[in-house]
C-alpha cells in the first residue's frame, strides 16, 4: 500500500470556524456547500513517491471520497494554507504536473486562489468542489517546512505502517566493498527505511524487480546473476530484512510503486528459506568504461528515430528532442508522464526517469514539434514505439516542450571537487582532489585560459547547475590553506562530466602567472540563458546592395568593410554588401546579460548609443570546404528587447544609457537596413558558398547550450544575384543531412532532404 499521512480537523478548529462564520455572516449560496463540508470535517493527506514525510501530492477527502487538487493557478500562498491544514507551520515550495505521481479518483479543486491569510482551504476561491477540466497529470503537491504546529492534533493518522516507504535504494557489493570502481553495478539490494538500511527478501524476486531497481540506480537494464554464489555467501552472513513480497510489473519508475510488504517490528521469522535479493545492472555507454565493463555495441534497426536531450545542466536531463525526417523537433507535454520519460531515459543509456518535466522547464526549443500526447506503457524501447498524436499547428507551442530528469549512476565525481572562499555555496576558488604517489591531496587549478566551457564542466561536476562565470583571478576571495597548483592547461569542450576528462597538462604543471591570486574560480547558477537565431528570417530578408562609398564613412570608421575598402577611391565607387536581418531569441531560463559592466561600455557616435559587447555575432561567407572568404566586421553590439512573447514585458533598451540584455521570451532584432548589418562581398567571386552566423562565438556569456548558436545557409552567387536557402540552426538536422548540406552542389531548391 502506498504511504500516506492523514490528519483531520480538531474540535477546536471546528469551533473556531463556526465562530468565524457567525461573525462574517452567511456564506453565498454558490460557495456555501463547500464551506459547510469543510467545516464538518475535510481530511487531508500527503501521498506519492519519492517523498519525505513533509512533502507529497495533496489529497483531500470530502464526503467520504479522496481526491486531488489541480495545479492551475496554484501558488505558494495556497501551499501555505494546505501545509497548515496538514499540521505544518508553513510551505517552502510547491510542485506541479504530478511530480509525486498522478492520483486517482476525483479532482476536488481547480484554479485554487488563496491570499495566504485564510484559516482553511474552504475560504480560498476556486471553481467549486469537483468542478475541474484537469487530468491527474496536473496534480499539485506541496513541500512543507519540517516543523509542526504547536498543539496540532495528529491522532487521526491512519496506521503507523502506512508511514513506511522506500526512501532510497542502493547496491552493496557482497565482497570487496571499497575496492570496486564506481559505479557499483552488482550486489545486494538495500532499501533505506525510517530506521535505517535493510535488505530485501528474495522470495518471489523477479527480473521485473531487478529492472526497476537498476532503473532507480541509473542503469538502463539488468542481467542475470550467479545465484549459486550468492546463496552460498548468504549462508555465512547475518542479514537484516525489512522488506518482502516485492512484485513489480517492470515499468515502475520507483520501487514504492510496486506491490510490497514491510516486516512488522514484532516479526521474528523473517525471510524463511530465502536470502537477500541480488541484482546485476548493465551500465549505459557513458558509464560503461568507468565501471570496468566493456561498452556494448547496440545496433539500432535501420531507420529508427533517435532522441536527445538539450538545455540541461547535468547529464541525463534536458528538453526532449526527437528526429523525424532528418530534422530534430520537440515533444509536446500533453499526457507527458514518468512512463514516457523513463522510455527516453533508458533509450539514452540512463536509468528510469526521476522526473517528467512539462512547461518548457528546460527552456524552449525552436522549429518543429514532432510529437504530442505520447502514451507509453514503459516497456517500449523507443519513444517512437509509443502511441502518440500527430501534431498540428494549433495543438501545442514551445512553451509546452517536455523534458526529463533521469536517474544516474553514482560515480563519486562530486567528491573530487569543491569550492572555497566564495560568498555562497555557488561560487568560489576551484579545488580538486588528485591521486598519484602517496595519499590523495587537494590542490588548485591554474587560471591560464580558464573560461566558460571549463566552468560549465566544474559546475556540472559540483552538481551546482550551469556556469555563470569562469574566473581566471580569485584574489578577491578569502585565501584558504590550500596553496599548491595541481592542474594546469585545462581545456574542455563543455560536454565532459568532470574536469579530469578535459585535456590538461597532467603532472607537468605549467602556469604563466603563479600564486593563489591567479587560480581558477567559478560562479554557478541554477538557470541560464539560451540564444537562438531565427534562421527563416535570414533566408527571407537576404539581398545584395551596391552602396556608394560616400554613404559608408560611418561604417568605415567602425571597421565594417573589407580591408580592400581602405584602398578604394573615396568617395567614389561602391561596395557590394550582402544584407539580411538577424533576430536573436532568448529561449532559456535566465536573461542574457553582457559580461562587461556599464562603466566599460563604449559610446558610438554613429549609432547614438552605447555598445556593451565587442563580439556578439560573427557573420561569415565560407567555401563548401570551410575556408572563410568574407566576414562581417561589425565592431560591437547593443543588446535590447525589440519584441517579446505575449505576457512578457521588455526590460532592456539601448536608448538613454539603459540597461542592456535580452529577456527570457524576448528577441533582439538587427534589421537589414541598419549600418554594419551586412557582409562586404565586393571581393567574392561567383560560386557556391555557405553563409554562417554564430552567436556569442567566444563563449563570453554563459548559456545552457552552445551547440545551437550557429546558423548555416546555402548560397549561390552568380556575380550579380545571390540565392540564400536551406537556412537552419547548426544542430537542427541529422548528421547525414548535415553531410549532404556540406556537399551542396548548387541547386536552387529550398529542400535538402
Curated annotation (Swiss-Prot):
Catalytic activity annotation: L-lysyl-[protein] + O2 + H2O = (S)-2-amino-6-oxohexanoyl-[protein] + H2O2 + NH4(+); N(6)-acetyl-L-lysyl-[protein] + O2 + H2O = acetamide + (S)-2-amino-6-oxohexanoyl-[protein] + H2O2
Effect noted on mutating residue 676 to Y: Found in patients with Stickler syndrome; uncertain significance
Keyword set, alphabetical order: Copper, Cytoplasm, Deafness, Disulfide bond, Glycoprotein, Inflammatory response, LTQ, Metal-binding, Nucleus, Oxidoreductase, Repeat, Secreted, Signal, Stickler syndrome, TPQ
Modified residues (2',4',5'-topaquinone): 670
Region (Lysyl-oxidase like): 529-732
One of the GO biological process terms: epithelial to mesenchymal transition
Signal peptide: 1-25
SUPFAM superfamilies documented for this protein: SRCR-like
GO terms for cellular component: collagen-containing extracellular matrix; cytoplasm; extracellular region; extracellular space; membrane; nucleus
GO molecular function: copper ion binding; fibronectin binding; protein-lysine 6-oxidase activity
Top enzyme category: oxidoreductase
Skewed-composition ranges (Low complexity): 290-302
Record: glycosylation sites: 111, 266, 390, 481, 625
Location in chain, cross-link Lysine tyrosylquinone (Lys-Tyr): 634-670
UniProt EC number: 1.4.3.-, 1.4.3.13
PANTHER family: LYSYL OXIDASE HOMOLOG 3, LYSYL OXIDASE-LIKE-RELATED
Function per UniProt: Protein-lysine 6-oxidase that mediates the oxidation of peptidyl lysine residues to allysine in target proteins. Catalyzes the post-translational oxidative deamination of peptidyl lysine residues in precursors of elastin and different types of collagens, a prerequisite in the formation of cross-links between collagens and elastin. Required for somite boundary formation by catalyzing oxidation of fibronectin (FN1), enhancing integrin signaling in myofibers and their adhesion to the myotendinous junction (MTJ).
Subunit structure: Interacts with STAT3.
Protein name as annotated: Lysyl oxidase homolog 3
Organism: Homo sapiens (Human)
Gene encoding the protein: LOXL3
